[in-house]
Amino acid sequence: LPALLFGVAALAGARREAGTWAHLIGLDLTERISRRSQYERWAGSYAWSVVRAAVLAVLALTGLNALLVAGRLAVEWTAVVTVAEAIGGGPLGGLLLALLQIGWLPTFTAWSIAWTAGPGFSVGADSLYSVFGATPATAPALPALGALPGTWSPWQLLLLAVPIGAGAVAGVWLLREGENHLDDWLHTRHGSRAVSLTLSTLALAVLTGLLTGLLLLVPLALTSGTLGLGALTDIGSHVWAVCAAVAGWVALGCAAGYLTALAVAGHRD
């Protein structure tokens, strides 16, 4: 342990002295970048901004759906407690059950993402929960599952605003970042501001949406699978359908957020 602490302290000191991790291992990225052409530098900064925007969209989507899960548990708390009381188990069993449900919270959040995106999720082969409709079925005796959505209501369509809103957050951030160099390139080539803005915004939105969907691929796959035989062989979301839907909604929100933020900035100027 002392050797580990000394090593970490020495590494931190060397990193502080070098200024960057690249300098620490003898690489001068600034000098390498300066040898690139203007278009290569634009492409690099553009790609990096899209990656960060997609990560931001994933974080926003996850946070909003975590709030939805918490809100749903609060609203259906009576049903949750009823299932817990039916299970019994005493103090120790109740504690273990509570810890089990806490461990399932990331899974519930992933299911909520699938729910708000449209394709939905299943808790059993005969069930489907989505903002477009619901087919409830008997669920495993886990208290938190007492908060599963019941019958479908038209107002649930409003929850499509969740992935669209996550995309809008990414779009606003992209404008503030100011790395939409494709717009600059198209404008110099065609001279039409309307054409360059339309095409560059479309490209930015599509790339951000696609990358957001790809980033969700692994988490959604990890929260889908089987819990046994029979009806419980189908648990979780249809991963590819959800990723495609998220990509579309985020792209829509990204374009809307980017153009809205641009209009607001232009109005202020």
PLM features per residue range, with description:
Residues 159-211, 215, 247, 251:
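Basic, amphipathic N-terminal segments
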Residues 20-34, 185-196, 264-269:
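Short, highly charged, low-complexity non-transmembrane loops/tails of multi-pass membrane proteins
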Residues 33-51, 89, 188-197:
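Cytosolic juxtamembrane amphipathic/interface segments immediately preceding
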Residues 1-27, 58-69, 73:
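Transmembrane-helix bundle segments that line or gate the permeation/cavity pathway
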